[in-house]
Regions:
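Helicase motor core with emphasis on the C-terminal RecA-like subdomain
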Residues: 1-137, 142-145, 170-173
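Non-catalytic terminal extensions of ATP-dependent helicases
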Residues: 35, 42, 65, 108-223
Length: 223
């Protein structure tokens, strides 16, 4: 994800944007990385002093810093109209949070991008946050269910805008703009291939590794 972010910022070096990360440690690491590559960047998280948070926020609002790297502590009450992109380098815990944070891009009505970089370890981080919270078990279960929906969003082939609208109980046509709508890859039914793999594993009594299974399926004569 670091490589993607660096390449993206190089292509959009004159644009203002927000990069969200799930932990203070990750915010500070990303900020150091971007400064090392000479990007105009500020950071925001709850561990900074009130004065430092205010300064960094103002630097971003008045375009003295083009990019803000932040936890979800940043954004409430912020109305910066010319944000051209919002990148989530870590998956949020709920689709509501993602929708709210991604919606900080393009408030001036001009074309903008919302990008989610999905990594399994970030889902595990969200699991940790839920477990460490002082919520009761019923509330924790609801949070796990919301995280599951967020994971479904990250993996769906449906129009992303439709997915969000459906989640909030609304209907709408495909947007024609999201990465799924613009994906030109051809869908392929792999049911038969999957059945062959599972059958081979079963016939080999589930005792051999994936390399030998692959050799058998490809007709290799290796003994």
């Amino acid at each position: 994800s670091d490589r993607f972010i660096l390449d993206y910022l190089k292509l959009n070096s004159d644009q203002s944007g927000i990069i969200y990360a799930s932990t203070r440690k990750e915010v500070e690491r990303l900020t150091r990385l971007l400064k090392k590559h000479h990007f105009s960047v500020a950071m925001y998280h709850g561990g900074l002093s009130k004065e430092q948070r205010r300064k960094n926020q103002d630097d971003f609002l008045y375009d003295r810093s083009l990019v803000m790297v932040a936890t979800n502590a940043f954004g409430m009450g912020i109305n910066k109209s010319n944000v051209r992109f919002v990148i989530h380098d870590s998956v949020p815990g709920t689709l509501e949070a993602y929708y709210q944070e991604a919606g900080r891009a393009g408030r001036d009505g001009l074309p903008s991008e919302a990008i989610l970089i999905f990594k399994l370890k970030d889902v595990q981080t969200q699991h940790f946050f839920i477990e460490q919270s002082d919520r009761d078990e019923q509330s924790k279960q609801r949070e796990y269910e919301k995280l599951q929906i967020m994971t479904q969003y990250a993996n769906t082939q449906q129009c992303l805008q439709q997915f969000i609208l459906n989640y909030f109980g609304e209907d709408g046509p495909k947007c024609g703009r999201c990465s799924n709508c613009l994906d030109t890859r051809e869908a392929r039914d792999i049911t038969v291939d999957t059945q062959k793999v599972l059958s081979c594993v079963y016939r080999m009594n589930e005792r051999f590794g994936k390399n030998l299974v692959a050799q058998v399926l490809s007709g290799s004569q290796v003994k």
